[in-house]
Curated annotation (Swiss-Prot):
NAD(+) binds at residues 13-18, 156, 272, 299, 301. This is Glycerol-3-phosphate dehydrogenase 1-like protein. It is found in: Cytoplasm. The gene is gpd1l. It is an enzyme of class 1 (oxidoreductase). Belongs to the NAD-dependent glycerol-3-phosphate dehydrogenase family. Coiled coil: none annotated. Plays a role in regulating cardiac sodium current. GO terms for biological process: carbohydrate metabolic process; glycerol-3-phosphate catabolic process. Keywords: Cytoplasm, NAD, Oxidoreductase. It comes from Xenopus laevis (African clawed frog).
């Protein structure tokens, strides 16, 4: 497969993380002949104080709703029409909430040329009749293109502020992974490419469940020792889940990359899932209410992923093997007391 340069890039999504990535790509392509100098970014159109969000981004070069305070390069062009945004794109960067991936892929299927490559930055999983489905699998099936994944300890505002961090690209085709590394790497955004792509992607989804448990601990003022236990036992459940559900062999080394333990730590200390879970305990409000209040209406991935994982575990009759994942689901959706997160640790199979 040979893509003729300069390669056109389209970012499918423009939330907090999508806008931070747009800032990186916009700056990078200016200095590289391999990539086209204009970057399309699909924006779900919204009205902000009577003005269209796309108009604000294209004139003021700032996503004032989802990444305020950070200027986007002028070569990043916001487009409200998804088909227009992806037209003629060689490289597609998927960065939308995971529940919208089916609709987006259906809309652009057949409208992207057959040699295009995708990379998903979406942290979530889906479920089908056979159980677990990865987001990359859905894109691959619906669009018939090769798809890599990027996951890591990457809190969007810190990335946009150009604070140093690492990330992991998982790609079953190493050359495709290296191409995306070339597009995305900066002195402060360092990338490792591995071929264990399914594990990389699962890490990105499952760590959000663990972060919700960490937030519950913070809400209960459990202390750092308990939170460390949540992180360790959460990591053990992530590894066990990957071993059961990944089609290809799982490398434990992948969990030591940025997508694994590093992302888990940063999310359990600094991410939105932790923050909202703590507020859930302290305020008694529902997850939905807190999303509106604290996230500008953006969706929290951790509780949703816990529900999908729970249903998959039920299908396999394995709920009891994953007490931390199960407790998060039951606290979020079944009204179980938050203290159950502690009792699930006390009787965790890791200690038996």
């Amino acid at each position: 497969m040979a893509l003729a340069g300069p390669l056109k890039v389209c970012i499918v999504g423009s939330g907090n993380w999508g806008s931070a990535v747009a800032k990186i790509i916009g700056h990078n392509v200016k200095n590289m002949k391999k990539f086209a100098s204009t970057v399309n970014m699909w924006v779900f159109e919204e009205n902000i104080n009577g003005r269209k969000l796309t108009e604000i981004i294209n004139t003021e070069h700032e996503n004032v709703k989802y990444l305020p305070g950070h200027k986007l390069p002028e070569n990043v062009v916001a487009l409200p029409n998804l088909t227009d945004a992806v037209r003629d794109a060689d490289l597609l960067i998927f960065v939308i909430p995971h529940q919208f991936i089916h609709k987006v892929c259906q809309e652009i299927s057949g409208k992207v040329h057959k040699n295009a490559l995708g990379i998903t930055l979406i942290k979530g999983i889906d479920e089908g009749p056979e159980g677990l489905r990865l987001i990359s699998d859905i894109i691959r099936e619906k669009m018939n293109i090769d798809v890599s994944v990027l996951m890591g300890a990457n809190i969007a505002n810190e990335v946009a502020a150009e604070k140093f961090c690492e990330t992991t690209i998982g790609s079953k085709n190493k050359n495709h992974g290296l191409l995306f590394k070339e597009l995305l790497q900066t002195p402060n955004f360092r990338i490792t490419v591995v071929e264990d792509a399914d594990t990389v992607e699962l890490c990105g989804a499952l760590k959000n469940i663990v972060a919700v448990a960490a937030g519950f601990c913070d809400g209960l003022s459990c202390g750092d020792n308990t939170k460390a236990a949540v992180i360790r036992l959460g990591l053990m459940e992530m590894i066990a889940f990957a071993n059961v559900f990944c089609k290809d062999s799982v490398s434990i080394a992948t969990f030591l990359e940025s997508c694994g333990v590093a992302d888990l730590i940063t999310t359990c200390y600094g991410g939105r899932n932790r923050k909202v879970a703590e507020a859930f305990v302290k305020t008694g409000k529902s997850i939905e209410e807190l999303e509106k209040e604290m996230l500008n209406g953006q969706k929290l991935q951790g509780p949703q992923t816990s529900a999908e994982v729970y249903r998959i575990l039920q299908q396999k009759n394995m709920v009891n093997n994953f007490p931390l994942f199960t407790a998060v689901f039951q606290i979020c959706y079944e009204g179980k007391p938050v203290e159950d997160v502690i009792s699930c640790l006390q009787s965790h199979p890791e200690h038996m």
